Amino acid sequence: MTNLRKTHPLMKIVNSSFIDLPAPSNISSWWNFGSLLGVCLIIQILTGLFLAMHYTSDTMTAFSSVTHICRDVNYGWLIRYLHANGASMFFICLFLHVGRGLYYGSYMFLKTWNIGVLLLFAVMATAFMGYVLPWGQMSFWGATVITNLLSAIPYIGSDLVEWIWGGFSVDKATLTRFFAFHFILPFIIAALAGVHLPFLHETGSNNPSGLSSDADKIPFHPYYTIKDILGVLLLILALTSLVLFSPDLLGDPDKYTPANPLNTPPHIKPEWYFLFAYAILRSIPNKLGGVLALVLSILILAEVPFLHTSKQRSMMFRPFSQCLFWILVADLLTLTWMGGQPVEHPFIIMGQLASILYFLLILVMMPITSLFENNLLKW
């Protein structure tokens, strides 16, 4: 009798995706982050659901409802901090997942890569709206500053901002709609992830060498299920350690001051995972130019497959490209640090130089270096 998992209409989908899936025998731990992102999404949806049961999206009561969750709800503090720090873990896994894709040439799977870029935008939008919900000082002013950027769009900008606000400033209407979108977007992300996977399984996974692994495949279960479970346990260990020992390590003290439209915080800044993009935005003195640079800093990922000039897929055997890749990583870390600094000398010029280097590396230096490496190998 044929195994039920191979014949049942629903179970055979799971079987072909997670059990009998042929996987390359040499994929490293860098391939764990896809499953970790799935776990992060589940954690966020579950903790978010329980938070939504107690949260009120009204400007008068939003801040006190979050306080109520932390003080009066059973393990409310744990749920709230798991959700807040879970977002940080989500972005750590996301950045490592994208970095792995760039290093090993996974972007050559065009459909999978483009849906991944869409997913990145969706997660960033969700995180931004979630940052507004506690209605602290940084929530209010962050929402005001970031939504105001849309006014840089010629002709329709001002109308668009007021349409998003639902009035003439960030107020109750804005908070209510942000809560609605923050609630629905994770399910859209889950649906997109459900499209991301079949496109990946259509081609099969890439591997560190960048060569075809058709000649040497192994079943996903038990080899990679065990490997993924280890990754999940390490993720949970890191998340619980952060939540239980230092829950506010990655947050901003201004979150604990109720929103006050009459008092601007000295330094308005987003959460740490947006600081690199925020630094790029601030480095351009022109408003429209800054907004374009901000969008392009992420959208540039969609261009990467078209900038691939090397005859080899992976960077595993390309030392010069490896050097540039790690310079890019260092540059992004520098931009992240710069985004959290006040707008004054020397941070202004440093931010501008780091922003120029970011675009130069991806658009010019990496493609030229790849051609140089081809030449060295007489290809």
From Swiss-Prot:
Residues that, per the record, bind a ubiquinone: 201
Cofactor(s) demanded: heme b
Compartments (UniProt record): Mitochondrion inner membrane
Recorded topology in the membrane: Multi-pass membrane protein
Gene Ontology molecular functions: metal ion binding; ubiquinol-cytochrome-c reductase activity
Gene3D superfamilies xref list: Cytochrome Bc1 Complex, Chain C
Keywords assigned: Electron transport, Heme, Iron, Membrane, Metal-binding, Mitochondrion, Mitochondrion inner membrane, Respiratory chain, Transmembrane, Transmembrane helix, Transport, Ubiquinone
Primary location: mitochondrion
Entry keyword Membrane: yes
Cofactor note: Binds 2 heme b groups non-covalently.
Binding positions for heme b b562 per the UniProt entry: 83, 182
Coiled coil: none
Binding-site list for heme b b566: 97, 196
InterPro entries per the UniProt record, alphabetical: Cyt_b/b6_C, Cyt_b/b6_C_sf, Cyt_b/b6_N, Cytb/b6-like_sf, Cytochrome_b, Cytochrome_b_C_euk/bac, Cytochrome_b_N_euk/bac, Di-haem_cyt_TM
GO cellular component, one term: respiratory chain complex III
Transmembrane spans: 33-53, 77-98, 113-133, 178-198, 226-246, 288-308, 320-340, 347-367
GO biological process: mitochondrial electron transport, ubiquinol to cytochrome c
Subunit relationships: The cytochrome bc1 complex contains 11 subunits: 3 respiratory subunits (MT-CYB, CYC1 and UQCRFS1), 2 core proteins (UQCRC1 and UQCRC2) and 6 low-molecular weight proteins (UQCRH/QCR6, UQCRB/QCR7, UQCRQ/QCR8, UQCR10/QCR9, UQCR11/QCR10 and a cleavage product of UQCRFS1). This cytochrome bc1 complex then forms a dimer.
Similarity annotation: Belongs to the cytochrome b family.
Further comment found in the protein's record: Heme 1 (or BL or b562) is low-potential and absorbs at about 562 nm, and heme 2 (or BH or b566) is high-potential and absorbs at about 566 nm.
PANTHER family per the UniProt record, alphabetical: CYTOCHROME B (PTHR19271:SF16)
Protein function: Component of the ubiquinol-cytochrome c reductase complex (complex III or cytochrome b-c1 complex) that is part of the mitochondrial respiratory chain. The b-c1 complex mediates electron transfer from ubiquinol to cytochrome c. Contributes to the generation of a proton gradient across the mitochondrial membrane that is then used for ATP synthesis.
Protein name according to UniProt: Cytochrome b
Organism annotation: Sorex minutissimus (Eurasian least shrew)
Designated gene of the protein: MT-CYB
